[in-house]
């Protein structure tokens, strides 16, 4: 995360991420993004959001996943829970901007890629993705 520009990183296997984020921010973050796609991670993200804050999920949960949150907190604490499919990207608008940010050194794209694979490795690539061994892979085409 720090390689990609994060100022802080919390290892959820070492500490309670909700408590750590609430301590770090003095009561919760204004915007919390969940990118894993698990209801546990989304619940933690919501719990780490401050009053008046937004929890944004870009992670794709498995079918049948359900989220339980204190419903009153949405209204009484004026929180927002937002879903964003594929980052709500508009490719024609956003990809040129992402490339510009990358060229300027403001967006570290390389750290988001776990590995390069060839087209004949695509099935192994999907298996590795399903097993959680990689986050992103780029297919290299020999043309």
Model-derived regions: residue spans:
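C-terminal hydrophobic helical "lid"/dimerization subdomain
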Residues: 15, 43-47, 92-143
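Short conserved AdoMet
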Residues: 26, 37, 50, 130, ...
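Rossmann-fold NAD(P) dinucleotide-binding segment
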Residues: 39-51, 57
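Glycine- and other small-residue-rich loops at beta-strand/loop junctions that grip anionic moieties
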Residues: 10, 30-35, 58-60, 84-87, ...
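Short glycine-rich, flexible loops that bind phosphorylated cofactors or substrates
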Residues: 40-41, 64, 89
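Adenosine-nucleotide cofactor-binding segment
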Residues: 1-44
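Flexible glycine-rich beta->alpha loop in the catalytic core of nucleotide-sugar glycosyltransferases
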Residues: 15, 61-62
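Rossmann-fold dehydrogenase core element
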Residues: 53-56, 69-111
């Amino acid at each position: 995360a720090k390689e990609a520009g994060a100022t802080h990183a919390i290892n959820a296997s070492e500490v309670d991420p909700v408590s750590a984020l609430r301590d770090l921010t003095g009561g919760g973050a204004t915007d919390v993004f969940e990118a894993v796609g698990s209801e546990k991670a989304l619940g933690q993200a919501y719990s780490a959001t401050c009053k008046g804050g937004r929890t944004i999920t870009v992670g794709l949960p498995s079918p049948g996943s359900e989220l339980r949150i204190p419903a009153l907190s949405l209204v009484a604490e004026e929180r927002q829970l937002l879903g964003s499919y594929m980052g709500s990207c508009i490719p024609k608008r956003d990809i040129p901007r992402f490339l510009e940010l990358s060229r300027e050194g403001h967006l570290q794209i390389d750290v988001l890629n776990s590995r390069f694979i060839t087209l004949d490795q695509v099935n192994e690539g999907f298996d590795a993705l399903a097993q959680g061994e990689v986050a992103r892979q780029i297919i290299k085409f020999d043309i």
